[in-house]
Amino acid sequence: MKKKTGGMRIFKVFGLFLFSLIFFGLLSLATFPKFLLFDRLLIQNKIFLIAQKVKENSMSIELFKGKVYFQNREALEFDYTKLSLGFLSVNGKILCRGKISEISYSFLGSIETKFRDFSCTPFVKKVNGRIELSDGIYGRVKLEGFKTELALLDEINLNFKGQTFTGSVKYLGMELKGQGRITLNRKNFLMSKVDGEFKGNGVRIKVQGTLNNLRVYMK
């Protein structure tokens, strides 16, 4: 009987310790300047965020009227963004021109994005689709009015299948079809390598480089 009482006492002490650990962990997270940590993570990847107003809540950050710059160029703008801490994840919602897009980052190692008429980047007129990044890239995405240094591509449809992708490109009334490979860099997603080609009607478009430095060749 004494052994049982001792075991219960140890269990209660362990439970109290675990509860205290979780409580003080959440408390420190709630009081920590989360935007500074978030901003530091962006700067490490040469991404700079400017917002007119920042509001920090206990488990979330709200950003109002901001822009994101990458490699000294404007990458996107937004009217409102909210980043919330979930169970083993960080969830984000981006509001721009009345449309909401979502992104979810899991601490288990995956990222999921959902775009709904996203039109807040100078490089693309509109983006729709869903993409999941885990051991590879999965999902579909449609880009309308994609601007390159060489030409304006009317529409791009891509289907990601892990380490490969297939799709089509509409350009000057022509439809080019092709495929390619993605060599994923888990430590730095923007350094993942891309090698793809689209052909049709005697025209060939070659895409090579990394996600942060894509080069488009037309022949």
From Swiss-Prot:
It is a single-pass membrane protein. It is found in: Membrane. The lineage of its organism: Bacteria, Pseudomonadati, Aquificota, Aquificia, Aquificales. This is Uncharacterized protein aq_1287. Keywords: Membrane, Transmembrane, Transmembrane helix. GO terms for cellular component: membrane. It comes from the Bacteria. InterPro entries: DNA_ligase_ATP-dep_CS. The chain crosses the membrane at residues 13-32. One of its GO terms (molecular function) is DNA ligase activity. The keyword Cytoplasm does not apply. Its main location: membrane. The keyword tRNA processing does not apply.
